[in-house]
């Protein structure tokens, strides 16, 4: 490898440390404290400490190192990852019924992510701010207001983009991981006996000794791997090699040293269980560590916020969420986006969670169900890809699936015990998002089918218009068409009511491909249907935002000249009426009407100059 390539790999690896590992990297703030806080019926005992440390270490090895970094990250769509990408890949070579099942799984996984992102900023920032209690116990009443202030500032800067701030993420997180390692190593040197917990037999002994209680305690252990989905979801930003290199060279050693350092401290000073992370540090270092922890948790929260923006754009482009305003905050990086509606809805949800739960330890009970539920679905979808797309041996794939589920299912089941104490929160949010996504998709399909029931052939209409043309007026008219070979409603209504047609007519269809990006060479396809009619199909990936001005610039390069300010864009605006339905479908219909009313209008969605748009209304019963 050349020197330049090595430097580039080092830079990307450093950047991956700053973005990908923020969530899992701040887990030491609260994980071991929750494991040994006494809620499971045992205190800081040697066997319990060794058992939890062994479980945490081997979860990091099996779930993160083996399952995600080695297996799941093999499943990419043009380098992109994430649960919806996995859903798309898994459904490519399967039957229609199987594809429907896989789509439902993918949507549930995506919905769980929305439930998780409400909790991550709250628990991360609160855990860091709670370090104030070690410095000055009388400041404990300031934890909630300070957490809200920090997160308010974070959500307010989202509209300015994170490009400049992002440059600071990597060095701050690298410093964070080095401090984690240093604090842990210092404690381990003072009590090296704790390293015996690396032996997986301590995990086995933990289950044998504590039986049912040990199973329930898995709900706390899983806190050590929250954020693992980010490794796969952010694969498109950094690539597989940098993410893997960052994990094995920096993140895994640092996390292991810190967890075992906390364990060594607790074996000598059980009273440190009130906050073992901050008590690892010497007294003089508490305030700098508190500041660094606050910065690290803000970075972890930023990564989650950026993730929900990306997931939302993907869901919108794939037709599972209604169109909404998406702002690009960087001219250089297409992945840096800001969605105002999502930003402020997430902010208010996070503030409500902080005020309601008050302590990170209370919020820990809500964490885990969404994470482990997504892990189960990822196992099923990724092994489906291995069998159907990679054509691996079915017995080998079955063995892999069983191995994954033997870990994922117990973790998910253990977290169900948290349902009444907070686990209902991400589950409820996930269910709400699942209902919204499936409602939009199914009702949108019903609407389009209803609109296209007129049965007229596009070819027949064009032939008729060319043979017996109506009054033709100068200029170019563009009619947005949702599907090929379907007559746009706006065209029918223009002919019916205005009885005129422009000299040149373009039927424009914007299509979302099953890929993150579409090369400019394949962006536009032009077909002349008659002397005065053209069909233009513009293809975009689900990580791209359609732009009509760009489309016609490409058309001009291919011989179909079209000036935006001399062109009229005709669009149909549907006024929807609910027909007779069963009560449950009527409720879904009302939800769809609400979503439709608040959806971004097509001119804004496709960046068409407002003064060039003509909307023709039509009433449709669904």
Swiss-Prot record:
Q: What's the catalysed reaction?
A: K(+)(in) + H(+)(in) = K(+)(out) + H(+)(out)
TM regions (residue ranges): 9-29, 49-69, 103-123, 137-157, 165-185, 213-233, 247-267, 276-296, 337-357, 363-383, 396-416, 419-439
Keywords, comma-separated and alphabetical = Cell inner membrane, Cell membrane, Ion transport, Membrane, Potassium, Potassium transport, Symport, Transmembrane, Transmembrane helix, Transport
Classify the main location.
membrane
Q: What is the annotated localization of this protein?
A: Cell inner membrane
Q: Does the keyword Ribonucleoprotein apply?
A: no
Q: Which InterPro entries match?
A: K+_transporter, K_trans_C, K_trans_N, Kup
Q: GO molecular-function annotation terms?
A: potassium ion transmembrane transporter activity; symporter activity
One of this protein's Pfam families, by short name? K_trans
Q: Report how it sits in the membrane.
A: Multi-pass membrane protein
- The answer, when asked if RNA-binding is one of the entry's keywords, is no
Taken from the UniProt entry, a GO cellular component term is: plasma membrane
Query: Function of this protein?
Result: Responsible for the low-affinity transport of potassium into the cell. Likely operates as a K(+):H(+) symporter.
Hey, which family's this protein in? Belongs to the HAK/KUP transporter (TC 2.A.72) family.
The cross-references to HAMAP family, in alphabetical order and at most eight, read: Kup
Q: Which NCBIfam families match?
A: kup (TIGR00794), PRK10745.1 (NF008015)
What is the protein name for this chain? Low affinity potassium transport system protein Kup
